[in-house]
């Protein structure tokens, strides 16, 4: 018998790959959720928790959005039908969202950065894509100072209370 899922369990997403460095290196303007067109062996490899998006980016090309340089290693049992690990992968977005992304990239200094790859509650592979602007070195130092201050403040409040 199938156990009914609670609302909290239903909304959970299984994160496969995360680009934690992106939140430090870029000022995130807007976040989009995009589907990703994958081959069968790529899905199997992702379900095993393999894959990295640390050095990847996305670009708008000919009215389509492509994920470039994302590494999904070959599936170990995929024999001759395996995929190429770093091939460009098409991202599935609404045309309005593609227009927003294209307009954002056309502006000076904006780029498309993947933040995470995950499986949603329906088992579909999704990419969390951010329209972001690169931070300067002094902005990064400011972020570090702010993070340290928050940590010290929490420590002081914890000791006091």
Curated annotation (Swiss-Prot):
Annotated keywords: Cytoplasm, RNA-binding
GO molecular function, one term: RNA binding
Disulfide bond entries: none
Organism: Sphingopyxis alaskensis (strain DSM 13593 / LMG 18877 / RB2256) (Sphingomonas alaskensis)
Task of the protein: Required for rescue of stalled ribosomes mediated by trans-translation. Binds to transfer-messenger RNA (tmRNA), required for stable association of tmRNA with ribosomes. tmRNA and SmpB together mimic tRNA shape, replacing the anticodon stem-loop with SmpB. tmRNA is encoded by the ssrA gene; the 2 termini fold to resemble tRNA(Ala) and it encodes a 'tag peptide', a short internal open reading frame. During trans-translation Ala-aminoacylated tmRNA acts like a tRNA, entering the A-site of stalled ribosomes, displacing the stalled mRNA.
Region (Disordered): 140-161
Record-given protein name: SsrA-binding protein
Record NCBIfam families: PRK05422.1 (NF003843), smpB (TIGR00086)
InterPro entries reported for this sequence: SmpB, SsrA-bd_prot, SsrA-bd_prot_CS
GO BP, sorted A to Z: trans-translation
One cellular component (GO) term of this entry: cytosol
Family label: Belongs to the SmpB family.
Subcellular localization(s) per the UniProt record: Cytoplasm
């Amino acid at each position: 018998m199938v156990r009914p899922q609670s609302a909290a369990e239903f909304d959970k997403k299984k994160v496969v790959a995360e680009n934690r460095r992106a939140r430090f290196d870029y000022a995130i303007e807007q976040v989009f959720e995009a589907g990703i067109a994958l081959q069968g062996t790529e899905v199997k490899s992702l379900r095993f928790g393999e894959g990295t998006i640390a050095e990847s980016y996305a670009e708008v090309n000919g009215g389509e959005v492509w994920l470039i340089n994302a590494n999904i290693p070959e599936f170990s049992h995929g024999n001759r039908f395996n995929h190429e690990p770093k091939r460009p992968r098409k991202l599935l977005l609404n045309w309005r969202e593609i227009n927003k992304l294209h307009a954002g990239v056309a502006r000076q200094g904006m780029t498309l950065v993947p933040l995470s790859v995950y499986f949603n509650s329906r088992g579909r592979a999704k990419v969390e894509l951010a329209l972001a602007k690169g931070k300067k070195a002094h902005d990064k130092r400011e972020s570090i100072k702010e993070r340290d201050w928050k940590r010290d403040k929490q420590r002081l409040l914890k000791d006091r209370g």
